[in-house]
Regions:
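Conserved alpha-helix/loop element of class I SAM-dependent methyltransferases that forms part
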Residues: 1-8
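Class I SAM-dependent methyltransferase SAM/SAH-binding core
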Residues: 11-15, 19-67
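A short acidic, Gly/Pro-enriched loop at the edge of an enzyme's catalytic core
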Residues: 66-77
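A short SAM/SAH-binding and catalytic strip from SAM-dependent methyltransferases
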Residues: 77-90
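A short glycine-rich, Lys/Arg-flanked "PGG" loop and its adjoining helix->strand segment in the class I
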Residues: 91-103
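Conserved class I S-adenosyl-L-methionine
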Residues: 106-140
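Short alpha-helix
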Residues: 154-172
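Conserved S-adenosyl-L-methionine
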Residues: 173-185
Length: 200
């Protein structure tokens, strides 16, 4: 429903596209998609997914989300899913994403307070329920290694989406709003997953 706000034939940047789920959804809506990721492996998975589903007009680009290789005002919309939380300089990323948006363009960020529980007692108290409700399983992954990495990331210490709203407002976004996202039947008193929508 969020992406139906984007007019058809718009140019959209899917930053941190991963295996291409959002790119596929955006392409299916008739949008001109550029799928960007820092990982060549993820770009290959995204290409495979789009090609298998018959979308051969998507552009792919290896890019650092914090230093984009695109000209100013290149896109009508920028979308991101589960990326901002693991960036070393998320403020720089937001500045870049607004830079490549056309005036009036929209930014859609879907993210979460994935590692707040490492620093925040309230989040630590609900983490078992969060894992249960989201079927959060990392098969074959040493979670202690991930936790060690997350401890060094700036947004692991921030409660969001308030942080996102504040930084986007400081970066002069024309409009910013956030919505907490819940799984069916989930009732968290703290924001775990959320969407941030901004207009340049």
């Amino acid at each position: 429903e969020y992406f139906r706000q984007i007019p058809e034939v718009s140019k959209v940047l899917d930053i941190g596209c991963g295996p291409g789920f959002f790119s596929l959804l955006l392409a299916s809506l008739g949008l001109k998609v550029t799928a960007a990721d820092y990982s060549e492996g993820m770009l290959e998975k995204a290409k495979d997914l789009l090609n298998r589903n018959g979308y051969h007009n998507v552009e792919f680009c290896r890019a650092d989300a914090q230093h984009l290789p695109f000209a100013d005002a290149s896109f009508d919309a920028v979308v991101s899913r589960n990326l901002v939380w693991n960036l070393e300089d998320p403020g720089a990323a937001y500045k870049e994403w607004l830079r490549v948006l056309k005036p009036g363009g929209k930014l859609f960020v879907f993210d979460g307070n994935h590692y707040c529980y490492l620093f925040n007692e309230d989040y630590a108290s609900i983490q078992p329920k969060v894992n249960e409700s989201s079927n959060h399983v990392l098969l074959g992954v040493k979670t202690n290694v991930i936790d060690d990495i997350a401890r060094e990331l700036p947004l692991s210490r921030q409660v969001r989406p308030q942080w996102d709203e504040d930084i986007l407002s400081r970066l002069k976004a024309a409009e910013v709003k956030a919505e907490v996202l819940l799984w069916e039947g989930e009732e968290n008193r703290l924001p775990v997953r959320f969407a941030v929508i901004a207009v340049k």
